[in-house]
Structure formats: C-alpha cells, structure tokens
Amino acid sequence: MANLEWVCVPRCYEVRKNCLTGQATLEHPLKQRTVTVVDSNPLSRALEGTDPLSQFARQDDELNDPLSQMVSEFDLKSKRRERDRTEPEDNTLQWSSRRLGILNRFTTNEKLSLSTSFLVSSGSLDGGNESIKAQTVVADKTKFRLEQLDHFDDGSMRHMMDLTQQEYIQRFEQLKQELIQSWHNDQRVKALKIAIQCAKMLADTTVLQFYPSQYVLITDILDVFGKLVYERLRAKASGDPAASAATLEREREAARDTCQNWFYKIASIRELLPRFYLELSIFKCYEFLSSSREEYERILQRLTHQLRGIADPLVSSYARCYLVRMGVTLTSSKTYIRENFADLFLIYPQIFRFVARFNLHPEIVTASSYLQLYAPAFDYMLLCLVHKSELHTQDILNECKQLKNNGAILMSVLSSFNSEFIATNALEFIALINASETPGISKSQLLRSLGSCVSSCPPLQEQRVTFLKAAFETINKLTDPNEYINCVETWAVFVSQYFTIHEVNRLLGELNTRMCLGKAYEKHYSQLQNILTRIMQNYRSIELLLIQPNFLPYLDLFQKESVRVEVCKNILSFYKQNSDEYTCDAVVTNALMYLGKILNDSVNALSVDDERRQIAQLINVFIHKVHFGNDLEQQLSFYVEARGTFSNLDAVYVTLVHAACKLATRNRSKSTGFVKACIAYCFITIPSIEAVQQQMNLYLLCGQLALQHLCLGQADACFEAALQLVNELPAATVDFDGKPRSLEPFLVSYMCNILATLIVVPDSPEQGVLYFLRLLLEVVGRHKFKVDSSAPSIIYLHSLDMLYVQSLERFPYHIKGVVSNDDLYGHDPKFLQEVNNMCAQVVDAILLQLKSLGVAQQQRSQAELALELFLRIVKYADLERETIAQLAVNLWLLANKAQSQLDVKTLPQTLRSVEIIYKQIKDASPIRAQTIAKLLLRVRSS
C-alpha cells in the first residue's frame, strides 16, 4: 500500500488517571475459600450420636475426682515404667547405645566355629519344664537338677566350622529365636540349656579380634533369657488384683519359691563362667527375694570374688563389664565397681604378657589391636564408676600413675571421665602421657583423646599456655607423619577456640614445615583439609585468618587440583556464611582474589553448569563484600582487576557490570568523567559474556544509565550495540528441566522496553532523524520469526505508538537535563513529515503481516491484529484522508469475517473504544470528531 498518506493528528484531550475505588473487606482477597459439605444418609439420622449407656458411662468419667484421675494415671505410668525398665533410666549408662558401635568396630575375615545342639531338629531332646517333682531329701533335688542340666544328647551336638562373620551372627539370631520359642512352649529347661551353651562360648577366644562382638551377640541372648524369667516371675507375683489379700500373699510366696528354684538350678552349673553369666542374667529377679540394697551389694561382691578364678584377662574383663552392667540396674552403690577395678589392676600386668607374645607373632593379632579389645569393657566400667559421682576419680588416677604400661587404662580414663575433671587436672594428665611407654598404645593415641577432652572443656585460663606448650613438645617429637597429623587434627579445635590468632598462625607454620618434609602432604590431604575446616569453624574471624603469613602457604600444600579446588570452595563458603561486614583490607582482598582465581582456573569446557554456578556464586559474594567506601576510583580498579582474574565465569562478569553501574550512581561530583569510566568499563566487559540475552539486557541497562547521567555518546553506543545483537539471539533456549523455551516473548518484551527508552533519546546529528528506530525496524525485518508468530506484529504496533509520541508537541516524560526530540526539533514540519513517512512504512509492514497470517490460515490472529491496527488508526491518524479511512473500514471488515473465532465481546468492545475516543475529542476538535462519527456509520452499515 505504497500510496498510503499517513498524517499523525495532535492529541486534543488530557490524559487522566482513573483511580480504582477501594472497598472494605473482612477477609484477605487471596485467601483460599473452602466449602464443607456434610452429606448424611436420611435413614441413618435417627441413629446419630451415642447410645444412652455410653452417655451414662461418659458422665461417670466426667464426674470422677480429678485427684483420683491423676493418681490412677500416675500409677499406670509407674507400672509401665517399671515393666519397661531393663536398663538404667539414664541414657549415659545404657548398653544398647554402645552395642551397635562394638559390632561395627570389631569385625573379622577369619572363619568362625560354633558348637550347639539346638540348631538341628531336637526331637530327641527333653524339653523339660521348670517344675521339679516333689522330693523328700535336699540331696535328691540337687541330683535331679544336675541330671536335667547334664542331659545333653552327645549325638545331637553340631560343630559348625568355617562360618563367615555374617553366618555366625545369623546362627546366634537363630539361637535367640529358638530360646524364645522354647520358652513359650513351656520348655523352660531347654531354654536354660541354650543360655548355658551360649555362656560357655564366652570362654572361646580363638578369634581374638572378634571377641567383643561375640560378647555382644551372646549377652543379647542372655538378656532375653533373663527378661523372660523376670517377666514370668513378675506375672506370678502380681496375681489377680481382684483376689483377696491371702490369695495374693500365697501367689507372691509361690513366685518367691519359683525364683529361688531358678537360682538353685543355676547354682548347680558346674562350670564357673556359665554359672556366673546365668546368675547375672537373672540378677534382677533378686527383687522377689530381697529389696535390701545391702543384699544386692553383698551378692555383687560375692560374684566379684568368683571372677578371680578366670585366668584369661580378656574373658575376665568382659565378665566384670557384664557384672557392672547388671549391677547398675538395681543399686547405685559404687563399692563393688571399685573392688572390681582393684582386682583388675592386680591382673593388669598379665595383659602385657599376652602383648609380648603377640609382638613375637603379629600374624595372629598386633599388640595395638589386642589392647583395643579391652576398650569397650574398660570404658563402660569406668563410666559407671564415675557417673554422677567423683568419689573414686582421683583414686583411679593415682592408681593409674602407679601402673606400669598404663596406656590402656589411661585411654579409657580419658574417654570416660568427666571433661571438667580432666580439664582441672590437665597438667597432670599431660605429664602422665609424656611419661607413658605402653607397648601397643602410642602417645599419639593418648594425645588425641586428651585433645578431644580439652576441646570441649578447656583447662583453667592461667594453665592453658603451659598446657599447650607441654602438649606440643610431645606432638612435635612424633616422627611418624601419620601420627603427627592425626594429633594436630584433634588439637586444632582446642588451639583455634581458646587461643589468639598468633597461636593459630604458629600451628599453620609448623604444619607447613612438617608436611613439606618428603612431600608428606601428598598422603594426608584429608587430614590437612579437616584441620583447616576445624580452625575456620572455631575461630572467631575469618578475615583475620586470611591475612596470616602462614595461611596462603598452607594452601600450597594442596598440590592435587581437585583437593585444592575443594579447599578453596570451603574457605569461600565459610567467608560467605560468617562474614557480615564489608572489607577494604588489601591483604584480605588479595587472599580472596587468590582463592577465586584458583576456582576460576578450574573451570573448563568439561565443567558442568552446576559447578560453574556454585563457583560463580561464591566469587560474587566476596565481590559484593569488597567495599572501599568513598574511594570510588579504588573500587573501580578492583572491578578491573576482578575482570581480568575471573575470565571463565559469565555470572561473575554480569555481577561486575551491575556493580560498576551501581558504582556510577554513587558519584556525587558534578563531573561526568567517573560515570563515563564506569560505562566504558561495562561496555568493554559485556562482549565477553557468552549469553546474548544477558548482553542485550546489560547494554540496555548501561545505555539507560548513561542517558540518565547525560553521557549521550556512550548511551548511543550502548543502544546500537544492543540492537545489533538481536539477530544473534537464538530462536530458543533450554530451560532448567531440559525443555526448549522460545525466546520470542523475551524479544517482544525487550523491544517494548527499548522503544519506551528511545522516546526520550535525542537524535544524533551524525546519524539522522530517528536513527535508532530505523535501525530497530531494520533489525526486526531481518530477524527470522516463526511463520505464525505474532511477535513482529506486536513490535510494529508498539513502534507505531512510539512514532505517534514523537509527533506530539510535548512528550509524556523526560529525563532531567536531556534535550529530547520535542525540544530539539520544536515540532518542525520536516521532522513531522519524517515521522509520518515512517508511520506509513510501519503500517505497510503490519499489512504484510496480515497477509502472511491469512496465507497461514491464522484467522483469529489476523483478526486480532486488524482490530489493533484499526484502533491505532482511529487514535493516531487523520481520518479525513480517504485512503486512511478506507483502510480502517477494510480492517474492520477483515476482522468481522473471523467473528466466529473471536470472543463475542471483542467487536462490541472495539466499537465502545471508538465511541470513547469520539466523546473525548468532540469538544476540543469537532472536525476530527465528525470524521470518527462518519467512520462509525460506515463500520456499522457494513
């Protein structure tokens, strides 16, 4: 439509803002509304509610005395607690919290053996029962009990050899289930025999390194047996609550007799070890015979004396552990535990006779591994001794000093005694460790245990320096790098938490020196990393740590790139989490730049997006925290340095551009030199960013910033660069979920944004009238859109809006200090003619889009575009010109053809919009109003 004569008409009405009328509301407008529908069956309405008897029962409950209810609830809870209490109420002494750790710690690859008669069909076995036939002589009763316990069918004994650890554990689980099943089948003696056979196995130390786990498995079965006996006796003693007092007393007497019978049976066992373990397994049953704490203590002392007959110190130690474990459930006395330790210290030298033997035959078990077998037993016994009582702590420590080869006991003391006691006697402990020479227990092990204790509870303030010096005198004498680094790993928490930065720096320096010898650091990356992590976790200021002379040399120990990168990530993560203040310290900044450069250099073509994103986020955090106050030039210099350092990370470049733009807004001087420097920095940085979208957005941002600060030349350069990138924009991008996402919506939004900005951009004398708009239209014309896309039509329509604004005498908005085209041209007729010509070109482009949509059979989109152009012709163009008026009518007819595909309200609303325009201008411009009225008549008549 080359002969189209477009003439923009002046706006002859005032734009008014219509305020939205408010309305009071009692509910939040975004609150979700829920409707509850109750649907009931009419036939069942008569049965709703509760029956009268239930109502009476409820009323009786409600009328109960509240105190009576409280008493009944308390009694119920007390009974439940008593029923469930098989271990000490204090979680510290509960064995169940330790058993899993023992099973995981003490394992073996050796083959195990097991001898039992209860994992085969036992039809020939006499299950027996717990009742004993009435005998007239006590000797006959004893003989009968022995016959019951000795009645093992030798032919049924099964020796299982070459079992793996897992198979061995499964066999014990089967034995446990067999015991439970026998008990519930009223085969009490069979259950007792299973328990005896299991207890006998505790004398077997063939596979030494598995003995603690073997002890756990067997005592689990003994615990089950003891619980079954106790529960049966308790059920007998409780009786029927409704029975008379005499009946209840007879039942309690019968329970006492049965209990005594169980202890007589166990006392008849000939071998010491199973007799000892079985009596302890039902030790809780002494409650039915006596409630005296003194009696319990007397029994425990008797059992302690029996243990003097066990020769093997390992078997003896775990038997004492079982004794203590059962004793703490009934008595809080510590006397029997102290006596056990007195006996233990007597047999303690025997342990090292075994150690000397294993030193000659390390293929069996090493001395260190053998001594570790005692740790669970010693630890638990010591813990029970000092729990809620420090009566014997000093005595144990004094006896420990007198012992030769006291390392094993000292290890357990450090792991079991209260940290407060250890902290109070810290110098005494360090002297004891320095003097200790125990085969199998190295000083590094003792020092690690002591370091863990003082990290949670430090020594007195005046003793700390002396204590630390004494400790590190010993640590620094360790020649094995593995022992040295393991010690320092534990002590790093103590040093960083309770000492100044100078001690931390000295520690890092000593580590640098020791680990560089023979490149020892190559084998200890994990420990070195843990040391650094613990220091950062416990020291107060990460910035103060970064400026220490030995900090960056410490990082040089991590020569392996993957470890080095992980360490740098860790440091920057701690800086991100624990540094809330800005920094301008040059040393801190250089350290952060050094860390960031390591991360930046690790990024390559094979790096995944998540890795890039994580690294960029860490670097961006410290870039934001580097702040030089009012020294803006120094801040910009830092950004320049950062740009050269982090060349592999687009996200960092985006952050730097935004930071430079923000820096430009802080300029308070009247000179625009610094702002120009910031814009120039951004203009140079943006092309290095790979993503075209981000480049376009940043160019537009920088152009708007330059325009606001009256840097017109730089603004023009930014806008031109942004428009030149449009044809490099890909058609689609990949979303986070892997699906392709079209970029046409982004392009439409971007073009609308830039058109709104170009309204106030003055024309450059070198480029001609409306250069940027011409460039925009040219770029849009070259861009490849989808065939059925509405994106170019929307851009052209908004371009028409922008051109109409250019024809106005006064633009709707301005930027202070910028001479826009309304002031620059002063409504010059030549300028208006250029605007009208461009409007005609834009309309021609829209008409071509209409034709393309028709060819593509997109009638709905075609009709909507026709109506949009129709309204703009009515608003902006001179309808007195016949070509314009006829074009408007043709557009209406085109839209009317697709009426069936449009919303029913679309056409009527369009006509109402034309009527509103007519009402707005009829007083100010009657002639133009008359042309609109004629157009309405032609439209309605068509």
Curated annotation (Swiss-Prot):
<comment type="subunit">
    <text>Component of the heterotrimeric retriever complex.</text>
</comment>
<keyword id="KW-0813">Transport</keyword>
<protein>
    <recommendedName>
        <fullName>VPS35 endosomal protein sorting factor-like</fullName>
    </recommendedName>
</protein>
<comment type="function">
    <text>Acts as a component of the retriever complex. The retriever complex is a heterotrimeric complex related to retromer cargo-selective complex (CSC) and essential for retromer-independent retrieval and recycling of numerous cargos.</text>
</comment>
<dbReference type="GO" id="GO:0032456">
    <property type="term" value="P:endocytic recycling"/>
</dbReference>
<dbReference type="GO" id="GO:0015031">
    <property type="term" value="P:protein transport"/>
</dbReference>
<dbReference type="GO" id="GO:0005768">
    <property type="term" value="C:endosome"/>
</dbReference>
<keyword id="KW-0967">Endosome</keyword>
<dbReference type="InterPro" id="IPR029705">
    <property type="entry name" value="VPS35L"/>
</dbReference>
<keyword id="KW-0653">Protein transport</keyword>
<comment type="similarity">
    <text>Belongs to the VPS35L family.</text>
</comment>
